[in-house]
């Protein structure tokens, strides 16, 4: 799977806070978000359905599943703004959500 970094909707305040604190924006706890894996044939319809809801206004297609595992290996890769690929590693340790 290849995820396009520039396609992931991240609010400026969140990105700025992560940069100041040295956090990886893709590894911090995040409530109220969803990732869906949808057939390419249905992607536009699924996106339109999500955007039709007030909670889905920032919904976006952020990547694609590669046809052959050998194309990218068994991992999720992130294509950076510079076009380079890097592995999106699994979180190490505990992800602590905000305590309400």
Model feature map: region roles:
Residues 38-44:
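Helix N-cap motif at beta-to-alpha junctions
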Residues 45-55:
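Short amphipathic alpha-helices in soluble, non-transmembrane regions
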Residues 8-12, 34, 66-69:
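Short gly/pro/ser/thr-enriched loop/turn and capping motifs at secondary-structure boundaries
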Residues 21-32, 81-90:
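A polyampholytic, Gly/Pro-enriched intrinsically disordered region
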Residues 32-38:
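Short cationic amphipathic helices and targeting signals
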Residues 53-100:
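Acidic, Ser/Thr/Pro-rich beta/coil linker or hinge segments at domain junctions
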Residues 1-30:
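Active-site-proximal betaalpha loop/short-helix elements
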Residues 27-28, 44, 68-71:
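Compositionally biased, intrinsically disordered low-complexity regions
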């Amino acid at each position: 799977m290849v995820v396009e970094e520039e396609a992931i909707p991240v609010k400026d305040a969140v990105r700025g806070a992560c940069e100041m604190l040295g956090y990886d924006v893709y590894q911090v706890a995040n409530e109220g978000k969803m990732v869906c894996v949808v057939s390419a044939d249905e992607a536009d319809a699924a996106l339109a359905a999500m955007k039709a809801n007030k909670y889905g206004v920032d919904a976006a297609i952020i990547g694609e599943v590669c046809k052959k595992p050998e194309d990218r290996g068994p991992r999720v890769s992130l294509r950076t703004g510079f076009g380079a690929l890097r592995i999106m590693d699994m979180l190490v340790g505990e992800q602590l959500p905000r305590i309400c």
